[in-house]
From Swiss-Prot:
Gene Ontology terms: cellular component: membrane
Species classification: Eukaryota, Viridiplantae, Streptophyta, Embryophyta, Tracheophyta
Record's subcellular location: Membrane
Keywords (A to Z) from UniProt: Heme, Iron, Membrane, Metal-binding, Monooxygenase, Oxidoreductase, Transmembrane, Transmembrane helix
Listed name of the protein: Cytochrome P450 716A2
Binding residues for heme: C420
Enzyme Commission number: 1.14.-.-
Bilayer topology: Single-pass membrane protein
Transmembrane segments annotated in the record for this chain: 1-21
A single GO molecular function term of this UniProt record: iron ion binding
CDD domains the record matches: CYP90-like
Entry superkingdom: Eukaryota
Claim: Cell cycle is one of the keywords in the record: no
Cofactor: heme
Amino acid sequence: MYLTIIFLFISSIIFPLLFFLGKHLSNFRYPNLPPGKIGFPLIGETLSFLSAGRQGHPEKFVTDRVRHFSSGIFKTHLFGSPFAVVTGASGNKFLFTNENKLVISWWPDSVNKIFPSSTQTSSKEEAIKTRMLLMPSMKPEALRRYVGVMDEIAQKHFETEWANQDQLIVFPLTKKFTFSIACRLFLSMDDLERVRKLEEPFTTVMTGVFSIPIDLPGTRFNRAIKASRLLSKEVSTIIRQRKEELKAGKVSVEQDILSHMLMNIGETKDEDLADKIIALLIGGHDTTSIVCTFVVNYLAEFPHIYQRVLEEQKEILNNKDVNEKLTWEDIEKMRYSWNVACEVMRIVPPLAGTFREAIDHFSFKGFYIPKGWKLYWSATATHKNPEYFPEPEKFEPSRFEGSGPKPYTYVPFGGGSRICPGREYARLEILIFMHNLVKRFKWEKVFPKENKLVADPAPIPAKGLPIRIFPQS
């Protein structure tokens, strides 16, 4: 009897392990697959992939394997799925031009669990719907009316958060700035206390999306699920209130992005629309806060570049009345400032890369990619390829003068039909931040030689970028 119990106990452990091992290996029994390693059952090479980012070199996972296999493509196993990782301009072009033909957007299962939908549609289908709803609000003709509002928020931000400070940490403040703008433009929310209440759970959700999806108390994933529920409840309340205001004619459809979506989305549960808004708020502030942070970093490191940015912004100021807000025409004159921001995004892409799923069998560079496999493309590895950018570690905004980089070599916003719909929104936000920053302040890094970053999942300075700040004379 005792031996039988032991046998059953051991069998209950071994047989599931053998099943998962067999399933794990069966994914890689196709002919002529790309070279590469599959790692351990279930987790594959996920820990190595995440560890590279947390150690400050998110491109290292890709570049080390590209160098080892010399194929421009390799296989691995990430987030519970078999993966092909494609690299370089040719890989980017292949994925971007075959969107919805051979590949579609894909996110780890953790996304569906953090943002559960009450509908039968997948996160991919929901993302397409959200994208279609957002597009009209992100066109230049729609964004023009936001410039003055963004400028006003920026002025208040620097007055309340930066002025009269001797020393501060940049990253938390850029997140506060971009989140305030997102809340104002998406939800007409300008109550600072309410904005602060939402900011922390947004950060918790973002860090949990690419964590190991183990829903146990205390894990990142578990905290992200709880934070998502809290956000959904709060945003659903805002949605119900806005519906009543629109019905009563108290607000305009043009007031903000939420009002526009409500008038065009049709029958949708408040909770599902709340998830769409939450996703937009994450996308609308998280990546741009990273760019703004590293703009501060590189302008501190290169005083001659700071000076050129300052001169460009002074020229714009000299043609405006005191207290006159920025306009779209002013933004269009910030060419050198935008070159600086572009070089920041080349060296530190706010998204290291994204995922796709093969919806059919196909070949790339002579290797077979099975239907159902996932794919990953790396912006960081492409941007630091000396074939495309000589001396890739050198900060050189002139790379973006004239015709700029060759197609598919510079991809901070992705490309093809899936190119980021908010790229013009991001450009406005970054340039308005730069304008208000340099016109008011000079600064220096507290730790001049400290350049370590941590990608978890997005890249941030390891210490948040402490600076000493001085009023502009």
